[in-house]
A protein has these predicted regions:
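HDAC/HDAC-like amidohydrolase catalytic core signature
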Residues: 1-332
Length: 332
């Protein structure tokens, strides 16, 4: 199943100039609809919103009350400026032109909550059907009391904890193959034995090039390791798939999960448009092998798998997602 929330989030509407192609989901859908085997079966694999919503109580299972309150009060615009890193230290704007905005940052927060609901629904569909790919989700840089890297709240942990509260899930895995370390997910679940995390990521790039201590001397949380941590050094593309296989094998030592979220970032792609992904340059063949290995690993163990788009920037970001879904849906 493929889950699509029409509209999505177009950052340019808010004056934000981060290079996320607003039409990457549309391009994926076009590629699937144009496939001679997949297109005629659209009614069997394409899903829309089921009305799920993310409420304050869902966020409070994961995030600090004072942080959640900022999103629902007068501090929402300041929150969005911080999380999307739109203001430099000297007060000037960074990748942000408020004069070009057609919608307010408060509206972006409302869109974000709607976007998060898709991650929860994706998990529900995976529990029902065995597989679901959400054309959205994957905000793995959301931390307990702050967000960075364009991630306001952590939709992955929020969805898992809601499923746990509802009794549909006891244990879960998160397999994160985005180019950037899933630092928020690792930090939020570090003391939670019910959630096992794997992250394979650039070993020296953002957020791992940020300071390891705050001005007050306390450690910063982005260095907290995932349960299975796989840093790839610059130039390590040739060992990527082998190290992924080794990491997946380690998961078998942990309790069998009721649900697996896969954070399927396309930003390791050699044609990605975000400068901070330059240390990991995989071609389409390697990215397809990555996704096939994860999907087959989970299929062999009959584990429900909920896939999230996560990172992927520039005009070609849709290509890795489309090729995997063509394979998964039995395309020509």
């Amino acid at each position: 199943m493929v889950l699509h929330y029409p509209g999505g989030i177009d950052l340019t509407e808010f004056g934000i100039q981060i290079p996320v192609a607003p039409d990457r989901t549309a391009q994926v859908l076009t590629a699937l609809r144009d496939d001679p085997k997949i297109g005629p079966r659209e009614a069997r694999w394409l899903l829309g919103p089921d009305g799920s919503e993310i409420e304050q109580e869902d966020l409070l299972r994961v995030h600090a009350p004072e942080y959640v309150a900022r999103g629902f009060g007068d501090g929402v615009e300041g929150l969005m400026l911080e999380v999307f890193e739109l203001v430099n230290a000297d007060g000037s704007y960074h990748r942000y032109d408020p004069d070009s905005a057609r919608r307010s940052l408060a509206e972006l927060f409302a869109d974000w909550r709607r976007w998060m609901a898709g991650t929860y629904q994706c998990g529900s569909e995976a529990l029902r059907h065995g597989f679901c790919f959400y054309l959205g989700g994957g905000a793995h840089h959301g931390h307990y009391d702050f967000g960075h890297g364009f991630c306001v709240f952590n939709d992955i942990v929020t969805a898992i904890r809601r499923h746990q509260a509802e009794g549909s899930v006891r244990t879960a895995w998160v397999i994160d193959v985005d180019a950037h370390k899933g630092d928020g997910t690792a930090a939020l679940t570090a003391d939670d034995e019910s959630i096992v995390t794997l992250s394979i990521h650039m070993g020296r790039s953002w957020p791992l090039d940020l300071p390891d201590h705050r001005p007050d001397g306390s450690p910063t949380p982005w260095f907290i390791p995932s349960t299975v941590e796989i840093p790839i050094e610059p130039g390590g593309e040739g060992e990527y798939l082998r190290r992924l296989d080794e990491g997946l094998a380690l998961l078998d030592a942990y309790p069998r999960p009721d649900l697996v979220y896969v954070v399927d970032g396309a930003d390791p792609y050699e044609h990605d448009g975000l400068p901070s992904t330059a240390d990991l340059q995989l071609n389409l063949e390697a990215l397809l092998a990555r996704d096939q290995r994860i999907s087959s690993f989970l299929d062999e163990r009959e584990l429900p798998q909920a896939w999230l788009m996560s990172g992927g920037y520039g005009t070609r970001a849709w290509e890795p997602f489309a090729q995997f879904l063509r394979w998964r849906l039995g395309g020509g």
